[in-house]
Amino acid sequence: MILITYDVSTETREGRRRLRRVAKTCLNYGQRVQKSVFECQVNSMEMASLKDQLLKEIDLLKDSLRIYRIIEPLEKNREEFGNRLAIDFESALIV
């Protein structure tokens, strides 16, 4: 699992567009846990693709992007509080 955090400058119209594109890219790989924070369950190939896509979107002079690798098992390394608990991607999903 990885944790993605970003800060995109939204002072211009182009910055606001970048922000939407970065968020949409992250949503394709995981779940939003805060406004600019995503948890993503990805393998190494997906990680490389996601990183490439994000680096194409952000402006390295105006924005910041951080990617953290989270040590498994998550149930021992994560505590959650509040009304928006994480989705367990490993368990069965009933639709």
What are these regions (language model features)?
Residues M1-V33, V37, Q41, M45-E46:
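Extended, hydrophobic alpha-helical segments
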Residues E14, L50, R78:
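A short acidic (Asp/Glu
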Residues Q34-S64, R69-I71:
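Short, intrinsically disordered low-complexity segments
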Residues I58-V95:
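C-terminal structural segments of small proteins and small subunits
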